[in-house]
Amino acid sequence: IGKELAGYQFRIQVSPLDCTGCGNCADVCPAKTKALVLKPLESQEVEMPRWEYMDKKVGYKQVVEPNNVKNSQFVQPLFEFSGACAGCGETPYIKLITQLFGERMMVANATGCSSIYGASAPSTPYCTNYKTGRGPAWANSLFEDNAEFGFGMAEGANRLRERVKRLLEENMSAFSAAVQAAATAWIAGFDDKDQTLALSDALLAALEKETAPVA
């Protein structure tokens, strides 16, 4: 699977109880000997404990950056087990987008199929990263104003971030050296999409230990 992944093995572990039987995976498999073959559910019950083991004990190992198609598929999808129709052509794209951007992703969902399987209360196919707890923020407006709705979500998030930045700058002198260093780094990387999550984690960790009342 590549030099950068030496020491690892890659496995597609199917959840038999969640497979919709559309056959797409078997159809598109390029191998001469198919890696995935559709079989009756009764014969695949042995895969259920294997799925549980892979989910709870193995999980995803994100040791490479998702900067190409292959590497993106080693990242945990933050969209899984939707109630979309079997073989739906939309869901693979949503899965891929969450693998690339899911931890900092906001979805303003126009009304349609994706708004139905995206929020079939009380369940949702969107989930969080198993390590960080971050995942897509999702909402839908019924009023055919999706562009304005999404713009409002983005503007709201921007205003909150700008407020945090302003409060840090105004109170910088009251913080300990550790918080000052973390806050300065966060402000410097304010618009750096590749660094902001790590900088945010460092700032939060420093603030949790801060004793200054302003914190």
Question: What are these model-derived regions, one by one?
Answer:
Residues 1, 24, 41, 47-51, ...:
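Short acidic, glycine/serine/threonine-rich loops at helix termini
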Residues 38, 107-110:
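General beta-strand structural signal in soluble alpha/beta enzymes
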Residues 63-76, 195-215:
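Active-site-adjacent bridging/hinge elements
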Residues 1-21, 38-45, 72-82, 213-215:
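Ferredoxin-like iron-sulfur electron-transfer modules
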Residues 1, 15, 24-43, 68, ...:
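Iron-sulfur cluster-binding cysteine motifs and their immediate structural context
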Residues 119-158:
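Mobile "lid/hinge" segments at catalytic clefts and subdomain interfaces of large enzymes
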Residues 142-211:
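N-terminal leader/propeptide and maturation segments of large enzyme subunits in energy/redox metabolism
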Residues 91-96, 106, 116-120, 125, ...:
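Thiamine diphosphate
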